Amino acid sequence: MTFRNCVAVDLGASSGRVMLARYERECRSLTLREIHRFKNGLHSQNGYVTWDVDSLESAIRLGLNKVCEEGIRIDSIGIDTWGVDFVLLDLQGKRVGLPVAYRDSRTNGLMTQAQQQLGKRDIYQRSGIQFLPFNTLYQLRALTEQQPELIPHIAHALLMPDYFSYRLTGKMNWEYTNATTTQLVNINSDDWDESLLAWSGANKAWFGHPTHPGNVIGHWICPQGNEIPVVAVASHDTASAVIASPLNGSRAAYLSSGTWSLMGFESQTPFTNDTALAANITNEGGAEGRYRVLKNIMGLWLLQRVLQERQINDLPALIAATQALPACRFTINPNDDRFINPDEMCSEIQAACRETAQPIPESDAELARCIFDSLALLYADVLHELAQLRGEDFSQLHIVGGGCQNALLNQLCADACGIRVIAGPVEASTLGNIGIQLMTLDELNNVDDFRQVVSTTANLTTFTPNPDSEIAHYVAQIHSTRQTKELCA
């Protein structure tokens, strides 16, 4: 038997993990083993909301060292993280300033300023990326306007996965799928857009040419002295998750469900027409030149904050209590930017219900019910928008990522959307990360080949829509007339 051992470092906004994948060539089987899991989260430092990148790097190294201590020969390593955030370095490779998180308020008002000065349509035609107030375009403008004293010291700007790859290898890389999330990459040239960079205040010399997934960045030297290739995977975690989504045919949509919910479809061409602009659709880069035509939905961030504020530790018990409540008694628009990072999420949800003359969710289960129903209704809205954009309905929706373990939300989604839902794999970002590594090692031919492996090895669950459910009736009778606010458009 021929085996390959690949390690995926998968960093999300709330947690990170180092996973070992074992691929058996002859039977095309893939098994995952968690080596190290650790928490991630927002910190407050000098008035900014930041990431603790030193702690994350230590956790990554700890996980890699654990694999080596077991005597396992690692064939390659890949790193994926969330998008838009970056680390600045000087000529010696030392950090300049703080690793500020996208939920910081420093970008307030800058997206509107950019639209007024450059033109909303022109920005969209150049980048193809949705307007979100924390895009790197606006973060860099905030930095260069508010901290000009840092500019003379900056030599490089590395997005998060590229920064951690640099820390392991000493080599710099700017991976394409994650670079596209910045709203700074020109959709026609696949290179940094000089006009957008100029507005941001950044120097083009801070960036190297974006590279597509599949190249070897450099090597990490393990404690035993072996040099292990570090591969540029599809380093935006959603790009990796989509690679591992077992999409079957052109009528399949995906929903990457976690802190954020990303709903979309794959396309060989981007959608940058007026309809896409009005709907705030994004065209992020994917593997093999494909586009991830999708829309951001606030996702389980709302629930994560409620769990934290109410000190809830038993999520299955909460979901069971939630399931017993009637549907759609309280609904909000999860994509209202009031929910990006409020002081108190519970109070913000209650205020939104109060302002729309609804009953007020008070108990833990009522708050969770409000979130689940509201997400499912928004999923239905977005799926309809995407179908209209491309001129063809979808026949199935693949929900991947940690959120796909929530059977109640999966069923609500199926019922609200009126579509068959296939849940799994859970560790989609990790698997997609591994998939690119296996292609780089010449074990697999392409993404479609890898998806066949996922389909046969992953644990998938199907949810059939129930047209007689409460939420299905709500969609048919009431929700069709509801107006939803775009997320930060």
From Swiss-Prot:
Pathway: Carbohydrate degradation; L-rhamnose degradation; glycerone phosphate from L-rhamnose: step 2/3
Catalytic activity of the protein: L-rhamnulose + ATP = L-rhamnulose 1-phosphate + ADP + H(+)
Entry keyword annotation includes Cell wall biogenesis/degradation: no
InterPro entries with a match to the protein in the record: ATPase_NBD, FGGY_C, FGGY_N, Rhamnulokinase
Residues engaged in binding substrate: 83, 236-238, 296
Keyword Kinase in annotation: yes
Keywords: ATP-binding, Disulfide bond, Kinase, Magnesium, Nucleotide-binding, Rhamnose metabolism, Transferase
Superkingdom of origin: Bacteria
NCBIfam families, per database record: PRK10640.1, rhamnulo_kin
GO cellular component: cytosol
Oligomeric and partner information: Monomer.
Active site: 237
Disulphide bridges: 68-222, 353-370, 413-417
One record GO biological process: glycerol metabolic process
Cofactors (names): Mg(2+)
Function in brief: Involved in the catabolism of L-rhamnose (6-deoxy-L-mannose). Catalyzes the transfer of the gamma-phosphate group from ATP to the 1-hydroxyl group of L-rhamnulose to yield L-rhamnulose 1-phosphate.
Gene Ontology molecular functions: ATP binding; glycerol kinase activity; rhamnulokinase activity
Broad class of enzyme this protein falls into: transferase
One Pfam family hit: FGGY_N
Protein name per the record: Rhamnulokinase
